[in-house]
Regions:
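Central cavity-lining transmembrane alpha-helices of secondary-active solute carriers
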Residues: 80-98, 180, 328-341
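Glycine-rich segments within core transmembrane alpha-helices of 12-TM secondary carriers
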Residues: 165-194, 220-221
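Intracellular juxtamembrane helix-capping segments at the cytosolic ends
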Residues: 146-160, 312
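Helix-to-loop junctions at the C-terminal end of transmembrane segments
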Residues: 92-105, 190, 336-352
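Hydrophobic core of transmembrane alpha-helices in multi-pass small-molecule transporters
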Residues: 50, 119, 130-147
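C-terminal ends and interior cores of transmembrane alpha-helices
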Residues: 114-128, 359-363
Length: 363
């Protein structure tokens, strides 16, 4: 049987990748020029989160596979477990959101990153259900709840009113680069050691491929701590370009742990009070109706992180590059096409954009 040579296509592929690399450098350079008035902390926090999102991306694509292959959960049980975990950190975000103001950006980043490193250690070390639940998934949920709101606050403090959108766009770009790197690493390790192979780790012994992938996510979590460590805390960039040093908040207890617990307690109480007040306004229920309509679309997007790895392996076979198909392709499209789509649709209403985007996602 003869095969048609596709070697002729390689030069075109190289040109496309070369052009994409140049375009990416151009985008980041434009961000740098636009944010030249911002303190160096905006780059430190963004770079630290690139490593965090790389590790998080690797972890997300591995968890359901690992829960079934190593921990012993069925497909349905693994899916239900991940759904419950997602719900838990979503609720926790409500309580810890105000910690940034009470504790400070740097301290919250340190706490969240330490919890992420701690949890990922137990995710690859143990396969016992209760150990990975209590020492792995619980602190990981708290870590996500800590890190999610702090980024928004940090970017707001490190940019001026006229550059805040640019700051968020830069972070969104770097975040997707992190996700893409995670997909590449996920596939690369599986290609080397096999879908269900074993890897010998010095001092730790032999582990499965999926546990080794989680071990890699654990190691990638460390570099971000360096950039967080050299950040200045309690700084705020004013619109006139002056960098203000914010006064430290008065502690609510004798030590930081007591202070954090009291702040979380107050946060949940305040959130409940705000919800009661907002629920009396008709606009709130219109907004909730919009969210309910879009819930299915968003659910499919998040569901892909946990369902597609198993689906891809079963349909395409062991070793299929499922990380490249979804973990890389999706963020790369976002990085390169969001600026273009934003420019082409700059005169469209938000409602029109949401409607068309949801229809495309649902299709």
């Amino acid at each position: 049987m003869s095969y048609v040579s596709l070697s002729w296509i390689y030069p075109f592929v190289y040109v496309v990748f070369g052009a994409a690399a140049v375009y990416l450098i151009y985008i980041i350079t434009k961000y740098g020029v636009g944010l030249k008035a911002s303190p160096r902390e905006i780059w430190f926090v963004s770079i630290s989160q690139v490593t965090e999102f790389t590790a998080y991306s690797i972890m997300l694509m591995t968890l359901t596979l690992w829960l079934s292959s190593d921990v012993g959960l069925s497909d349905v049980a693994a899916g239900n477990y991940m759904g419950t975990w997602n719900l838990s950190y979503t609720i926790l975000i409500i309580g810890v959101g105000s910690l940034v103001d009470a504790v400070g950006v740097k301290k919250v980043l340190v706490i969240g990153t330490i919890l992420a490193i701690f949890s990922r250690f137990f995710l690859f070390v143990s396969t016992d259900f209760w150990v990975v639940t209590i020492l792995g998934f619980v602190p990981q949920a708290v870590s996500v709840a800590f890190l999610s709101p702090v980024i928004s606050v940090a970017l707001k403090r490190y940019t001026k009113s006229d550059t805040s959108a640019l700051g968020f766009a830069m972070f969104y770009t770097l975040m997707n680069i992190g996700f893409a790197l995670g997909g590449l690493i996920f596939d690369w390790i599986r290609q080397i050691y096999g879908e269900y192979g074993n890897v010998m780790i010095p001092l730790l012994g032999e582990v499965s491929t999926y546990r080794f992938i989680l071990f890699t996510a654990f190691l990638i979590s460390f570099p971000g701590m360096f950039f967080i460590a050299i950040m200045r805390d309690n700084i705020d960039l004013k619109d006139d370009g002056v960098l203000e040093i914010l006064p430290k908040k008065e502690k609510k207890g004798g030590n930081m742990v007591v202070s954090i617990m009291k702040t979380i307690e107050e946060s949940f109480a305040n959130a409940a009070k705000i919800f009661v007040d907002v629920a009396k306004q008709p606009a709130f229920w219109k907004f909730m109706a919009l969210l309910a309509i879009l819930l299915g679309v968003n659910y499919v997007f998040y569901h892909f992180h946990y369902t597609f790895p198993k689906y891809g392996i079963r349909v395409l076979g062991e070793g299929a590059k499922i990380g490249n198909i979804y973990g890389v392709l999706n963020p790369v499209i976002i990085v390169f096409f969001v600026p273009l789509i934003a420019w082409l649709t700059r005169k469209w209403s938000s409602y029109k954009m949401i409607t068309i985007g949801s229809m495309i996602s649902a299709a």
